[in-house]
Structure formats: C-alpha cells, structure tokens
Amino acid sequence: MQRFNTFNMIHKALRAMLYDTALTMQQTYFADTDEAAIALEKMNHVIHAFEQHGMHEDTILMPVISKYDQSMIASFEDEHKEDLSMGNKLMHLHKIYNATESSEERILAGSVITRAFREYMVFNLEHMQREEVELNQLLWEHYSDEELL
C-alpha cells in the first residue's frame, strides 16, 4: 500500500520552479538588463518560495515529529539555515549585478549568479529528496494516513 506523502505536491511545485528558473538562467544573456531582470525575478521568486516552505516546515511539521528523532530534525533545521544562507548569497549577488556598469561586468556577474543558483538548486533537490525519504519514514512510523491528512 502506498502511504500518504506529505511533501508530494509542494515538492513537485518547488522542483518545477527550480528547473524552470535554472533553464531561464542558462539561456539568459546577462548583458541585456531587461532579459536579466526576468531571470533574476524568477530567481527571487524561487528563493522566497523556499524561505516560506522552510519556515512552514520548521514551525508546523518539525515540532510535531521532533520528539521521535531530535537529531534528525536538527539536521533538517540546519539544512534550512544553509538554504537561507545560500538564498541570501544569491540576493547579494543580485545587488552586485544591479551595480554593474558595463556589459562585460554584467556577463561576469550573471555567470557567477548562474553558478550559485545551480548550487542552490542541487542543494534543495537533495534536501527535498532526503525529506521525502527520511521524514516520511518517521511520519509513517508514528502516524496513520488519516492523521497525516
């Protein structure tokens, strides 16, 4: 029997946002500020979505299951802090891009942002996969599907 996956819908949406934004970043010509603005707005939207998602998990989900495995929950909370740090780095790089004055500087800043976003994407993909395996297992050991719904 397949159990209820608490993360299924939101993680699908978050992964789609990551993939879409990564593709946009990959295809953006950062010397063109109008084109870059579209990519950077998508990036900001992704960062905000992940911040909200992490905050939701930390305030709603983690307190409910921390009594079953505090060290596991602490490791996820640490990863949420790392995610915030990576998001802040991307926002800082965005500010640097906005301060550029030449096409060459914009292209270089765009390259750095794109690389940092790929790292952010990989981190979050691995984090969500870990949640879907480890946290679901913990939830399934202690709660019925009816309780999870």
Where are these regions (language model features)?
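Small-residue-biased structural context
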Residues: 1-149
